[in-house]
Amino acid sequence: MAAITFHLDVVSAEKKIFSGRVETFQVTGSEGELGIFHGHTPLLTAIKPGMVRIVKQHGHEEIIYVSGGMVEIQPGTATVLADTAIRGEELDAAKAEEAKRRAEEQIQNQHGDMDFAQAASELAKAIAQLRVIELTKKRR
């Protein structure tokens, strides 16, 4: 028996990253992890930096990094509106490691004019990118 699917779009300010039928997808919402299946209650919520794990028709998976944004669920369709969205295989591990190191350094060497919230946000994004890279490598 074929799984029930619904339409998912993952878009950023630059481009549409994914558009197609999916069995399910997971994303980190502002209140925790969300697993979305066909027939989910309509919802509009903020998403945190992390991944969108997509299970396409026939069980094929795709992982996309998002830097935050919104997810909207409507009957038969869902849209992830990301600030930035990058396919897992397109992420650069060296750049993510460097961004993580810089953010950790800024947090440890706080000065009066340093924006702690900005550094913490950059650290969360770098850690999320590294996690997506790790999961993408395991899938291959």
Swiss-Prot record:
One cellular component term from this protein's GO annotations in UniProt: plasma membrane
Keyword Ion transport among record annotations: yes
NCBIfam families, per database record: ATP_synt_epsi, PRK00571.1-4
Record's bilayer topology term: Peripheral membrane protein
Similarity comment: Belongs to the ATPase epsilon chain family.
The keyword Cell membrane is assigned to this record: yes
Gene Ontology molecular function terms on file: ATP binding; proton-transporting ATP synthase activity, rotational mechanism
Protein name according to UniProt: ATP synthase epsilon chain
Assembly and binders: F-type ATPases have 2 components, CF(1) - the catalytic core - and CF(0) - the membrane proton channel. CF(1) has five subunits: alpha(3), beta(3), gamma(1), delta(1), epsilon(1). CF(0) has three main subunits: a, b and c.
Function comment: Produces ATP from ADP in the presence of a proton gradient across the membrane.
Annotated organism of origin: Vibrio alginolyticus
Alphabetical keyword list: ATP synthesis, Cell inner membrane, Cell membrane, CF(1), Hydrogen ion transport, Ion transport, Membrane, Transport
